[in-house]
Amino acid sequence: PAKIIGIDKNADIAVIKISADEDLNPINIADSNSLKVGDRVLAIGNPYGIGISVSNGIISATGRDYGNPYLELIQTDAAINPGNSGGALINENGNLIGINSKIYSNTGAYQGIGFAIPSNVVVQIATQLIRFGEVKSLWIGNFRVSSITLKINEKITPALRIIEMEKVGPLHEKGIKVNDIIIGINKKESNWNNLTQSLRFATLGENLILEFYTFSEKFKTHEFEYTEEKT
């Protein structure tokens, strides 16, 4: 029997507590921050329900955002198919470096681009789920962005276009929509690094100031108070 301790829907990670009849040997967890492009890896899973399988590959990239400012992923060419999600991504020493998460594919099947949640992020999420039963992260809504440039007052400016957003949370409540463009973050340049830093290293109760360019109202500024993520 197993008991669910907590779930983080954004990362698609859950912690369960099981009652085992015998002692289990936990996997050793490696530091995912030490990963390098080209490192050899193995992906473990149950593709298409055919049974436990192992595929091999390399680290193709690290820090892949997939447009999600709350999560950076490991990219690998190890075969990850439906049924592999939730399986371990391990290094050559058999240590956990990530949890297989998703693939980029036009067909829904393996095309050489798979993603895993880094082990350090998994530990951080699991620790909060065990302590609090939920993830207490700083949250202004669930959304994805892409980097663009925008010409404002004859000046080329870096910006972030919202390409996907759920209709829940502070962004939605302020009337922000898909295709609205973030042109400033806390009075700084609007780029991926500033967005992720502002979300990860803020304190509850602080405010986030985002400047937008929209095709309906042109320029507008919104202030958001950081709140805990609602899972």
What is the meaning of each model-derived region?
Residues L171-N194:
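Conserved PDZ fold ligand-binding element
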